[in-house]
């Protein structure tokens, strides 16, 4: 009170040592620092377990909270393609519920733990089957080449009361398929769950190629199991390799697919590259799945998998009408408000600038007219297949899968510096007033709840490429009608892919310096780059009040696809419906062929690319280097789009792009493509090794670039005498090896090069002899970069996870985000519970860099399709021959 005297005192003479308090309270409330989310994992049922319809399934979880208590554990189940349905809640340990009267079906079960501070964590899903006592078969589908045999296994779902005989009987339209062993199998109460083998042989009746038969395994008192077997043409041993790998990829027990049938980026969960978690997926992964199924259709005549892959893509990655509300409000005269890109993540959020002129969108009207919808038909690039982050579907928290995004802060933002966010941002997570949006821009002064999707154009083009080969194979079999509907969707996707051919803000194409000085484009004639840029994106208000679209400005050589451009320009079965789609792709084809001639080094490797917006801000922050050469006014960039690591140092971008060139050359015989390949192929073989005898299989670990190309001239292209590439180190990347083999195979088949054919065969033989395992193909990888799990932000180097001072937010599991949360691991604490985390922890503690054997979906598919491509183009050549 005023006028009252107070005396304070302290023991300033104390000389002891104070220990840090472990807990303290304020007015009785415990203070523990930033709340740590709980941990949770399902302990019952077991993955793959089978139950009887109508029974009660016991669902249990182990849950704990390091800095508090577990308030509750909620359990959910979903069917493939369905949403999560609550099945019970437990508030005390042991966390167990009884799921009563479960109907027959396939289910995915998860547990969601909530702690005393409201933080949540979602467990990994567990897939179970509910059926009566049944005969279990694996795999459910099998392809057997003529003159060869294949196998499947049989077991029982539960113990019989006495010895039980399982009989296997064939039915269907293909008498050429027969059981040669395992027609009768005996199971006892002791060995009921030990798989026994059935062998199926295919005859040699040419009329039965593509035929199918169903082999039904039955036993008294048990439901039957059935395996569909397709008779494949006899080609070479390489197609046997293809079918073996296809079976491994499609075997649910091997973990390539989620319980909902979504292909994972990798079988393994602890993997950090473009996706920051192995059980995310990408449009790239889906494109490889479609390619895999196209080749499977060629070998077997079965097109079910091809159509199913596209249906899954459309269901999970292409936003539905409800997921992109208000696209009818889009104003093509004002596609988007300008926001500059910055050199470093710590220069964000960037300020939007409505005063910068933007061009008009020339595609919107004709696409809406052609397809009767204002919606964009394109896949988002990244999907959290298991809802690991917990955003759910449009922030409902539990829906799976969940559309997310990561990279948004300029060329120096590596995966280690990303802040994952939901594509549908309703401010439920992140910052309470802006969600995650205020990490990236200032919102023009305010923020609106919104959705935003980013497309990866190279994946879309690969989908078109795969669809073309499916069309060719199915037509040769007289089965084109089986995939007509899917081909129409691929053509539609290719039509929308044209959004990648422009400057980001539809500005003038070429010589575009100064965000204000560079004029807005007014038509295709002055704003179309004609090259596949790194992305395009679209979004809008959650309430549908406004919407926007942008392109990408920067073209990387590794994203170009002349094969897809040629297909969309010329193939009647994949022709876009829009009036100018085919012509646009014809123009792009010519531009891409010129682009590669411009970027080819003296040695043969293809240099980085070019941009219409230097630095992502039209040179406002820093102009292009003096004398920087140009391609139709686009500025040369040796590391386009991202710099950590340099974007064109990976040899895989060489093989990916040149494989498409080789397909295009094989299909058309275009001399322009041949000239580029004639120089690239000898260089690629000179920097790679493949020796089946020793198991040596290497490609360059890193490519370094010096000099620059000559400024492009259509009438007199330069020789690029000053542009050079140096290959250093070696790497055994099995996926890149498969891509290289495929490139050389197409080139050899058209050019007659025996050295290219031999090298391709050596790659394939070495892969199969030395790098196969139970899941597919892999090689040991040392991951020294995993030291960056705990790399803190440094204002000196600009590296490490940057969160602006004063910015705070939370993830669905309660993990707090702030400038103090400045490591990759701090916002992904669940990584410490990964089965392989101990390898990383040992490294962080001073041990050796961890070694992993990864099974990436794209890599397995690249290998599988390389086997089939060689079998198709050199059918009389067998392994080792």
Which sequence ranges carry the predicted segments?
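Short boundary segments that mark the start of a structured unit
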Residues: 132-235
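Extracellular low-complexity, O-glycosylation-prone Ser/Thr/Pro/Gly-rich "stalks"
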Residues: 1-33, 790-846, 851-881
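Conserved beta-strand->loop/alpha-helix structural units within folded catalytic cores of enzymes
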Residues: 279-319, 455-477, 484, 490-500, ...
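Extracellular recognition modules
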Residues: 9, 108-114, 199-201, 216-218
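N-terminal module-boundary/linker segments of secreted carbohydrate-active enzymes
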Residues: 235-311, 478-491, 553-554, 575, ...
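Extended ligand-binding clefts on enzyme/binding-domain cores
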Residues: 251, 315-445, 454-458, 484-837, ...
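Terminal edge beta-strands and adjacent linker/stalk segments
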Residues: 9-29, 122-130, 217-234
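Long, low-complexity serine/threonine/glycine- and acidic-rich segments characteristic of extracellular
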Residues: 1, 31-132
């Amino acid at each position: 009170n005023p006028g009252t005297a107070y005396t304070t005192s302290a023991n300033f003479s104390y000389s002891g040592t104070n220990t840090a308090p472990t807990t303290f309270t304020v007015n009785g409330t415990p203070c523990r620092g930033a709340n740590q989310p709980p941990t949770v994992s399902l302990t019952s049922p077991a993955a793959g377990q089978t139950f009887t319809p109508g029974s009660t399934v016991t669902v249990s979880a182990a849950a704990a909270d390091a800095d508090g208590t577990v308030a509750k554990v909620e359990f959910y189940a979903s069917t493939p393609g369905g949403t999560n349905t609550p099945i019970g809640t437990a508030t005390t340990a042991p966390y167990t519920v009884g799921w009563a009267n479960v109907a027959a079906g396939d289910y995915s079960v998860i547990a969601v733990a909530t702690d005393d501070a409201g933080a949540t964590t979602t467990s990994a899903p567990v897939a179970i089957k509910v059926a009566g006592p049944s005969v279990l078969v694996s795999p459910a589908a099998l392809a057997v080449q003529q003159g060869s045999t294949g196998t499947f296994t049989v077991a029982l779902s539960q113990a019989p009361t006495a010895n039980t005989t399982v009989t296997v009987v064939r039915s269907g339209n293909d008498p050429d398929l027969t059981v040669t062993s395992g027609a009768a199998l005996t199971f006892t109460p002791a060995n009921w769950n030990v798989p026994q083998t059935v062998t199926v042989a295919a005859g040699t009746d040419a009329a039965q190629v593509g035929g199918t038969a169903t082999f039904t395994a039955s036993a008294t008192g048990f439901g039957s199991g059935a395996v569909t077997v397709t008779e494949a043409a006899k080609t070479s041993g390489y197609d046997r390799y293809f079918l073996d790998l296809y079976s491994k990829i499609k075997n649910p027990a091997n973990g390539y697919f989620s319980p909902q049938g979504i292909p994972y980026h990798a079988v393994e969960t602890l993997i950090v590259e473009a996706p920051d978690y192995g059980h995310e997926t990408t449009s790239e992964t889906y494109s490889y799945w479609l390619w895999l199924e196209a080749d499977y259709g060629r070998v077997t005549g079965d097109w079910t998998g091809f159509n199913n892959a596209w249906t899954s893509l459309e269901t999970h990655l292409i936003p539905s009408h409800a997921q992109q509300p208000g696209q009818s409000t889009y104003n093509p005269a004002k596609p988007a408000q300008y926001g500059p890109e910055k050199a470093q993540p710590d220069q964000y959020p960037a300020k939007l600038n409505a005063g910068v002129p933007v061009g008009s969108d020339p595609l919107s009207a004709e696409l809406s007219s052609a397809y009767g919808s204002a919606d964009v038909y394109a896949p988002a690039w990244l999907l959290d297949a298991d809802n690991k982050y917990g955003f759910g579907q449009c922030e409902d928290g539990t829906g799976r899968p969940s559309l997310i995004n990561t990279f948004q802060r300029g060329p120096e933002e590596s995966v280690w510096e990303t802040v994952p966010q939901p594509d549908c941002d309703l401010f439920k997570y992140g910052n309470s007033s802006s969600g995650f949006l205020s990490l990236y821009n200032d919102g023009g002064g305010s923020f609106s709840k919104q959705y935003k999707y980013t497309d990866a154009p190279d994946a879309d083009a690969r989908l078109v490429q795969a669809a073309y080969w499916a069309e060719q194979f199915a037509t040769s079999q007289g089965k084109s009608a089986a995939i007509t509907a899917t081909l129409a969707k691929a053509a539609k996707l290719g039509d929308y892919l044209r959004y990648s051919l422009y400057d980001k803000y539809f500005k003038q194409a070429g010589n575009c310096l100064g965000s204000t000085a560079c004029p807005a484009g007014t038509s295709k004639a002055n704003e179309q780059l004609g090259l596949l840029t790194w992305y395009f994106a679209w979004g809008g208000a959650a309430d549908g009040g406004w919407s926007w679209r942008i392109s990408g400005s920067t073209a990387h050589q590794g994203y170009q696809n002349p094969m897809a451009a040629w297909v969309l320009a010329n193939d009647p079965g994949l022709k876009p419906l829009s009036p100018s789609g085919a012509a646009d792709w014809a123009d792009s084809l010519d531009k891409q062929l010129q682009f590669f001639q411009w970027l080819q080094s003296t040695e043969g490797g293809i240099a980085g690319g070019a941009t219409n917006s230097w630095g992502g801000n039209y040179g406002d922050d820093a102009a292009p280097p003096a004398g920087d050469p140009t391609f139709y006014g686009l500025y040369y960039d040796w590391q386009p789009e991202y710099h950590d690591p340099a974007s064109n140092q990976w040899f895989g971008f060489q093989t990916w792009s040149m494989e498409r060139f080789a397909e295009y050359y094989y299909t058309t015989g275009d001399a322009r493509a041949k000239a580029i390949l004639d120089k690239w192929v000898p260089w690629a073989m000179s920097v790679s090794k493949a020796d089946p005898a020793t198991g040596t299989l290497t490609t360059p670990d890193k490519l370094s670039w010096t000099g620059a190309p000559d400024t492009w001239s259509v009438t007199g292209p330069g020789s690029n005498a000053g542009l050079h590439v140096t290959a250093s180190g070696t790497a055994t990347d099995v996926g890149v090896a498969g891509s290289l083999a495929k490139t050389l195979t197409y080139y050899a088949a058209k050019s007659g090069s025996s050295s290219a054919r031999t090298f391709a065969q050596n790659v394939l033989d070495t892969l199969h002899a030395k790098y196969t395992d139970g899941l597919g193909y892999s090689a040991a990888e040392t991951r020294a970069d995993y030291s960056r799990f705990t790399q803190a932000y440094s204002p000196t180097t600009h590296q490490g996870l940057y969160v602006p001072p004063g910015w705070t937010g939370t993830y669905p599991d309660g993990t707090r985000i702030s400038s103090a949360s400045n490591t990759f691991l701090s916002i992904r604490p669940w990584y410490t519970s990964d089965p392989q985390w101990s390898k990383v922890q040992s490294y962080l503690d001073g041990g050796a860099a961890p070694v992993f054997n990864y099974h990436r979906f794209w890599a397995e598919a690249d290998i599988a399709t390389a086997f089939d491509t060689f079998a198709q183009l050199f059918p009389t050549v067998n392994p080792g021959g």
